[in-house]
Regions:
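Loop/turn residues immediately N-terminal
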Residues: 1-2, 44-47, 80-83, 134-138, ...
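Conserved beta-propeller blade signature
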Residues: 37-40, 74-76, 84, 127-130, ...
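Short loop/turn segments that connect beta-strands within beta-propeller blades
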Residues: 5-9, 50-54, 87-90, 141-145, ...
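Extended non-catalytic domains of envelope/secretory-pathway proteins
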Residues: 4, 33-38, 49, 127-128
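Blade-level signature of beta-propeller repeat domains, shared across WD40, Kelch, NHL, RCC1
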Residues: 157-182
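Loop/turn-rich, solvent-exposed surfaces of beta-rich toroidal or solenoidal domains
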Residues: 77, 107-142
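Extracytoplasmic beta-rich repeat domains
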Residues: 7-35, 43, 54-71, 94-123, ...
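Low-complexity, polar/charged sequence tracts that form flexible coils or short amphipathic helices
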Residues: 39-41, 49, 58-61, 76-78, ...
Length: 182
């Protein structure tokens, strides 16, 4: 990753290499930027840097999803489908619970076999929206406590990136049909 000063004297501020020696190509998630913070995540870890390239913290959390930041909290779903809430300032994990156990607690149902790996993580109107590989939409309240508001199974598989426009979610399914969900 490069930090470039293109405004004044067009120079490189700093360079960071996140690729392991054993890797041919670095496979990371999209970079998350908020104010003066840069979050880099890959299949093995999540790291927070400031704009000067200094590492603030680094956690050994395996995730294939980019984290989401809101205020002082970083939201992550790890590879084992655990929801983690991390303090942005110091990297301490404030909350960690299996999504399946949240569902069992709030809905008294065991959907572990039905809900597959989480593929998408969004923060919308103060709630987390998790979308599983097999199109379960899980809405999680995060204001006062962490609990599940709703679970909805949709009859389609998402095969594109998701776009949010005018309070609607737009995406393409496997048979190349466009869907709008509000």
């Amino acid at each position: 990753m490069y930090s470039l000063n293109l405004i004044n004297n067009k120079r490189i501020n700093w360079i960071k290499n996140f690729k392991q020696e054993s890797e041919i190509i670095y496979e990371g998630n999209p970079i998350t930027v908020q104010n003066d913070n840069i979050i880099i995540s890959n299949k093995n870890s999540i790291s927070l840097f400031n704009v000067n390239g200094n590492k603030i913290w680094d956690l050994n959390i395996k995730s294939t999803l980019p984290p989401v930041i809101s205020g002082n909290t970083v939201f992550v779903v790890n590879k084992d489908n655990f929801l983690l809430l991390i303090n942005k300032n110091d990297g301490l994990i404030k909350y960690s619970k299996s999504i399946n156990s949240l569902i069992t607690k709030d809905f008294k149902k065991n959907l572990k076999r039905k809900i597959k790996k989480i593929d998408y993580l969004y923060l919308i109107d103060g709630k987390l929206l998790l979308i599983s590989k097999n199109s379960y939409f899980i809405e999680i309240n995060i204001k006062d406590s962490v609990n599940i508001n709703s679970i909805k199974k949709n009859p389609f598989e998402i095969s594109s990136d998701i776009i949010f426009l005018n309070k609607e979610m737009i995406f393409i399914n496997k048979s190349n049909r466009i869907y709008k969900v509000n």
